[in-house]
A protein has these predicted regions:
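Phosphate/pyrophosphate- and phosphate-bearing ligand-binding catalytic cores of soluble enzymes
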Residues: 2-3, 40, 131-176
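Anion-binding (especially nucleotide phosphate/pyrophosphate-binding) glycine-rich loop
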Residues: 1-121, 125-127
């Protein structure tokens, strides 16, 4: 839409440890963390700081367990998994956005939701200034919902990485 809007500061980080260096309480005008911006439209200037994750890694840890940086484009993860014969995210291919946002929004399509393949969401707690992990059961996933969208958690936790569990069975989900 080419909106002529701006923010006070735009900070992109490529390492989760960089978040520990920020003084969130001292940032004038507030702080907003964004993903790729595919579901976002600023219609006025933002007086504060915008943060964006450039944490981009995909690491196969143990067979079907894959750890992914929050800044990875979700469709790139789908392609990566397909190239390795890993099943689970294929129905979510071409959904715009990044891995961190996928965990926050519980993206879904064709009978599959992010919660079905997420094991752990790794976060930075801006209040305690510590890293913490949320197992999938703790994320309170629902239809396009999660604990990270709640009033209490929305601006408190920043997703830094997500662990997924994929399958090797070669069986697509076709029950939609």
């Amino acid at each position: 839409f080419r909106m002529k809007v701006s923010c006070r500061n735009f900070l992109e980080y490529d390492c989760a440890a960089d978040l520990e260096k920020l003084d969130f309480g001292a940032m004038e005008g507030g702080v907003k963390h964004i993903g790729g911006g595919s579901n976002l439209l600023f219609t006025a200037d933002f007086p504060g700081t915008i943060l964006h994750s450039a944490i981009r890694f995909i690491e196969q840890k143990d067979g079907s367990l894959v750890s992914v940086g929050a800044g990875v484009v979700f469709d790139e993860l789908c392609e990566w998994a397909a190239e390795r014969g890993l099943w689970g995210p294929e129905n979510l291919s071409h959904i715009p956005g990044e891995v961190g946002a996928a965990a926050v929004q519980n993206i879904g399509a064709y009978g599959v939701e992010a919660k079905d393949i997420i094991r752990t969401v790794h976060c930075f707690d801006t209040r305690s200034r510590r890293f913490t992990d949320f197992e999938v059961a703790d994320c309170r996933y629902g239809y396009r919902e999660s604990i990270f969208k709640s009033e209490e958690y929305r601006d408190r936790y920043i997703v830094t990485a997500v662990d997924f569990v994929f399958r090797r069975d070669g069986a697509p989900v076709l029950g939609y």
